Amino acid sequence: MVLLLVIIYLAFISLGLPDSLLGSAWPSMYGDLGVSIGSAGIISMIISGGTILSSLLSDRLIRRFGTGLVTFISVAMTAIALMGFSLSGSFIMLCICAVPLGLGAGSVDAALNNFVALHYKAKHMSWLHCFWGIGASIGPIILSYSLIQWKSWNIGYRAISIIQIVLVIVLLISLPLWRKVSSVQSGSDESNQQILSFPELLRLPGAKQVLIAFFCYCAIENTVGLWGSTYLVTVRGVSAETAASWISLYYIGITLGRLLSGFLAIKLRHKQ
């Protein structure tokens, strides 16, 4: 289970890598693409729409194919999408590539969150999202280096895509390990747990409040992540490569907060 947890953490690093790229690269991208600054919102909404859709379908997919295979296919989709981003020279092509990027991100996010919630402790869940922050912090740094060395955002996307491809290979090799864990758990109580529909989930005590809080948090996080670099470049006069590296500090702060929450989870009960 320890080896599998390491693989899960690596998968969440890969999940965070592309999440911070669009906002960091956009000050350099929109001019090359010949579109307005606000067009980043269209790409972001397509990615978010795919993420929401695949998250809602994740329960059926996991029960049909298993967490390991869903994670493998999802990361493969994000790797292909990122390679598409790196080869794109038009806004329409970016919008097309945003579809598999969102679908892949939503599936792997839901699948791994569900798996860790079932098989590990609250501290592991906090640290899981801490590793997402590590990936999100590294993404802008790689992009900044790409802009400094080659004056190209495409190469930054390509580098992240290659990292994703390496993880796809790791996940492919680890598929027997996922099946082994699933076979051990097949006779446990979790296989007999009641499956709730979405309306039934909303009727659970506190569910609506949690959704509202999560919505507000995501709105703040994504707004800063998407537009932070553009603000620094257009309003503060910072260079695009410097702005990209500065945004990584924002994600490092999130990472440290989630690391701390993992230690707090050891001392506090779930309701606290």
Residue ranges and their predicted role:
Residues L22-G23, P205-S248, I252-T255:
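Extracytoplasmic gate region of multi-pass secondary transporters
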Residues W26, S58, G135-I148, S229, ...:
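Small-residue (Gly/Pro/Ala) motifs that create kinks and tight helix-helix packing interfaces
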Residues W178-L211:
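Juxtamembrane intracellular "pre-TM" segments in multi-pass secondary transporters
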Residues L3-M29, V35, V224-S229:
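Extracytoplasmic
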Residues I155-P176:
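Symmetry-related core transmembrane helices of the 12-TM Major Facilitator Superfamily/SLC fold
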Residues S20, I47-L56, S137, Y251-L259:
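Residue-level signature of mid-helix packing/kink "hotspots" within the transmembrane helices
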Residues L53-I92:
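Conserved MFS/SLC helix-loop-helix module at the cytosolic interface between two early adjacent transmembrane helices
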Residues C97-F131:
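Cytoplasmic helix-loop-helix junction between adjacent transmembrane helices
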